[in-house]
Design a protein with these regions (language model features):
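The −1 position to Zn-ligating cysteines in a subset of zinc-ribbon hairpins
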Residues: 9, 29-32
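Cys/His-coordinated zinc-binding microdomains
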Residues: 14, 34-37, 41
């Protein structure tokens, strides 16, 4: 009779024996995996070495304006302009909000210079500035995530992205809200003090709106329940974060992290919110015209969204307490064809520049005609996914030429025109003299190949 083998599981993280490299057995059927042992060692080492050395390091870091680069609003907007086309209203709003947030942190860390203190009125020195989280409203592909990530890079602070649709209320299948904070802690390489000055971007926040206004016996664990769970984290609380993530359980080791100084940026498309605003505004005068007199199709969605009030978001499904913790609202415009053309070629890491670099590695120049760029932008508008559509369109256009190019030894320049974008033609290749060096191979390797061919 075959001997049955019983699968063992880690008593800490719950992983099976075949999912880890080593499982260590303890008394009374308790087991621990090598990954959890490593985490425990890290926690113990941090606590043991966190006395004198840790205090010295933290005080040294505290002298550097609170461990982040504090830029003026104009500088922040100028940096954002390098990466994000258009969206001036949103960039100005973000620049002011971020500047005030990190100035608040610097004040809280008591690292202001003597010049700053001398300018400050004595009546305000004991005033505590409250945190202002940010809500981004805008269509998909308009640059919400890019704005948030660019802010984190320029400020040199940890940054994490979370998807609100994966979150559920504690005790139900799905991710706990503490896992959002865990991602930030991981981005900070488990440096708690650094993580406490970071930025968290919560995407698809509109998807956790209350499903219905009707009272139901069924609990809304992924909608209103998640909003309730996020309240304390947004406002500021000390979270007990499990180092390995997952669900909490008794006797588990936690890392404590204060969210009071973490900047939360929540973003969502909020589809049809403009209709709610339209119904509320009615005949309210805007300039020399009224929304009542103009057909809805003639009013830009972004213009309506700028009139958004908390009551509109409540009607959309967000609870009042949640909205109150996102006082700063920035609206992003839907990208036009000219915006998409600028994104293709004029941003710091534009797709045209990225593909140009790939081609230059092969010793070949890449050129897009103006009508080709216009055609790509038109196709992106048809797909209705904003700037996200640009890469998929470019990948399709460039697939064949990038497949054949490495085998060509005489190609000097590749020209992409509208016919290529529309699928009615092939890229034009200008040939020259045979290249002496093949990209990707060293001169020694090529010399060896040549000698073998001669032999």
């Amino acid at each position: 009779m075959a001997k049955s083998t019983r699968m063992t599981f880690c008593s800490f993280c719950g992983k099976a024996q075949n999912e880890v490299r080593k499982m260590i057995a303890g008394p009374a059927g308790v087991h621990i995996c090598d990954s959890c042992v490593s985490v425990c060692k890290t926690i113990i080492d941090r606590e043991l070495s966190g006395s004198e050395e840790g205090e010295a390091r933290r005080s040294a870091e505290g002298g550097k304006k609170g461990r982040f680069n504090l830029l003026r609003p104009a500088e922040i907007k100028a940096r954002l302009d390098e990466h994000v086309i258009s969206q001036d209203y949103a960039k100005r709003t973000l620049a002011v909000a971020v500047y005030n947030h990190y100035k608040r942190l610097r004040d809280g860390l008591h690292t202001d210079s003597k010049a700053d203190l001398s300018r400050m009125d004595s009546d305000f020195r004991d005033v505590e500035i409250e945190k202002s989280n940010i809500l981004l409203l805008g269509p998909t592909g308009s640059g919400k995530t890019l704005l948030a990530s660019t802010l984190a890079k320029m400020l040199d602070v940890p940054f994490a992205i979370a998807d609100a649709t994966t979150l559920t209320e504690a005790g139900y299948v799905g991710e706990d809200v503490e896992n959002i904070v865990l991602r930030l802690l991981q981005a900070a390489e488990y440096d708690v003090k650094r993580a406490e000055c970071g930025i968290i971007y919560v995407d698809e926040i509109d998807k956790i709106g209350r499903k219905t206004d009707n009272v139901s016996i069924t609990r809304d664990v992924s909608g209103e329940g998640v909003q309730q769970a996020l309240l304390k984290i947004l406002e500021g609380t000390v979270c007990n974060v499990p180092p390995q993530g997952g669900r909490k359980h008794p006797n588990q080791e936690y890392i404590q992290l204060n969210t009071s100084n973490i900047l939360f940026i929540c973003g969502g498309a909020f589809v049809d919110l403009d209709k709610i605003v339209q119904s509320r505004v009615g005949s309210k005068v805007m300039g020399f015209d009224t929304l009542h007199d103009r057909r809805h199709s003639e009013v830009p969605v972004s213009e309506l969204l700028r009139e958004t009030q908390p009551e509109d978001l409540v009607r959309y499904g967000m609870i009042p307490e949640f909205i109150g913790r996102l006082p700063m609202v920035a609206v992003l415009d839907e990208l036009s064809r000219s915006d998409l053309e600028h994104i293709l070629q004029n941003t710091k890491n534009s797709l045209v520049k990225q593909y140009g670099k790939l081609f230059s590695m092969e010793g070949v120049k890449l050129h897009f005609t103006r009508d080709a760029l216009a055609a790509i932008a038109e196709k992106a508008i048809e797909l209705k996914t904003g700037a996200r559509a640009l890469r998929s369109i470019m990948e399709r256009i460039m697939l064949d030429i990038m497949y054949d190019l490495p085998d060509s030894e005489t190609a000097e320049e590749v020209v992409i025109n509208r016919a290529v974008v529309d699928g009615r033609g092939k890229p034009k290749i200008k040939h020259g003299e045979k290249r002496t060096a093949k990209p990707g191979k060293s001169p020694q390797a090529q010399a060896s190949e040549s000698s073998e061919d001669a032999a």
